[in-house]
């Protein structure tokens, strides 16, 4: 599959293997105790060994301190660190200097002004992940099953490398790709039967929908 597809919040060998067999380019393991997708570093490391070299391994953290990152990086040996909290550019630079790993920085989007937060990170992060802002009362920065208005990305500079996230599933991924021209997508709740429970049939449907969308849009991936 030409597009980067990340299945996030993986917790079982069955789900990890199935995601990669379908063509997932990235596998995400979440280290955030409040999340139903939280996994212990050693458990994630064992799962990652099953698919290492076949897909990128992403450690998803939320405002983690160095001690926590030390444990996660040691156990998982990730290819990418995804920082999904309020980490500022200085913190991103520090993390990159310590661990020598590419960093994907998540930014929450609800309105056009949220895109102003991109500039301070340019030249620092290796890729952005654009997620929807969590609903009121949610303790989770992502994985809430909500989307943002994808048309907001019309104003985005075409040179910005990003992964589209936020409530993506088999029913809406076609529209999301048509509107944004995204070359990388992320899903978690969109392939679950319950919070934290990956559904293999929903994974199948998601990848089928991505392939259908890829087949009908311009080769360049530009917006139609």
UniProtKB/Swiss-Prot annotation:
Transmembrane segments: none annotated. Its EC number is 5.3.1.24. It is an enzyme of class 5 (isomerase). Pfam families: PRAI. Keywords: Amino-acid biosynthesis, Aromatic amino acid biosynthesis, Isomerase, Tryptophan biosynthesis. Belongs to the TrpF family. It comes from the Bacteria. This is N-(5'-phosphoribosyl)anthranilate isomerase. GO terms for biological process: L-tryptophan biosynthetic process. GO terms for molecular function: phosphoribosylanthranilate isomerase activity. It comes from Sinorhizobium fredii (strain NBRC 101917 / NGR234). Pathway: Amino-acid biosynthesis; L-tryptophan biosynthesis; L-tryptophan from chorismate: step 3/5. InterPro entries: Aldolase_TIM, PRAI_dom, RibuloseP-bd_barrel, TrpF_fam. It catalyses: N-(5-phospho-beta-D-ribosyl)anthranilate = 1-(2-carboxyphenylamino)-1-deoxy-D-ribulose 5-phosphate. The keyword tRNA processing does not apply.
